[in-house]
């Protein structure tokens, strides 16, 4: 999606950086270490961290849940994500009927019921910038996932590929918007 858009529209005004944390559960290089090492650059330049962690619906969505939840800690980001999600629903009525798309704004202080949860890789990007003096902006998607997540039964067989497209499309379009509109 991005390469085709860049080819047609030129270089964006912002840099998009993609990070994966596949070994973090084994104590390997992860988001906390990355933020520690890149803290000054991230404090000065990070506009939004998008976390797609377990952002799918279980393959047995009829019995195990059919929802994805997209949430952020910034009201302006929420407004844009909400508008893109509504467009997605209009453009993809079968997907919108099949899967429940929830939205949330968690802009309260850390640990508060309305605060951004600190339970995944987005946490250090939100709360560890500039020694904790700068609150970073994040957008996260959680799916209803699978009961086997983080157990010895956690494998690709529970993955519902189709449901990955919801968050990838909504957040991908928002990232594209931010990349080409650096004043936002």
Question: What are these regions, as identified by a protein language model?
Answer:
Residues 4, 8, 14-16, 144-184:
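His/Asp/Glu-rich mid-to-C-terminal helical/loop segments that flank catalytic regions of hydrolases
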Residues 1, 79-87, 169-173:
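Long, highly charged amphipathic alpha-helices
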Residues 11, 23-139:
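Metal-dependent peptidase/peptidase-like ectodomains
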Residues 3, 32-36, 172:
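Short, well-ordered alpha-helical packing segments
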Residues 18, 34, 109, 133, ...:
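Generic preference for well-ordered secondary structure
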Residues 1-6, 14-22, 30-31:
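Extended, hydrophobic alpha-helical segments in both membrane/secreted and soluble proteins
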């Amino acid at each position: 999606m991005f390469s085709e858009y860049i080819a047609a529209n030129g270089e964006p005004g912002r840099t998009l950086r993609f990070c994966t944390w596949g070994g973090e559960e084994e104590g390997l290089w992860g988001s906390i270490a990355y933020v520690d090492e890149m803290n000054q650059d991230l404090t000065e330049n990070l506009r939004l961290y998008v976390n797609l962690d377990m952002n799918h619906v279980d393959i047995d969505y009829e019995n195990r849940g059919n929802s994805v939840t997209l949430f952020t800690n910034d009201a302006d980001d929420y407004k844009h994500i909400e508008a893109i999600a509504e467009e997605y629903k209009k453009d993809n009525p079968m997907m919108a009927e099949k899967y429940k798309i929830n939205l949330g704004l968690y802009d309260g202080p850390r640990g508060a019921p309305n605060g951004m949860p600190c339970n995944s890789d987005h946490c250090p990007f939100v709360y560890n910038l500039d020694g904790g003096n700068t609150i970073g902006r994040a957008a996260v998607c959680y799916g209803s996932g699978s009961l086997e997540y983080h157990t010895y039964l956690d494998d690709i067989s529970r993955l519902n590929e189709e449901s990955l497209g919801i968050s990838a499309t909504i957040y991908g379009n928002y990232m594209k918007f931010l990349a080409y509109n650096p004043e936002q």
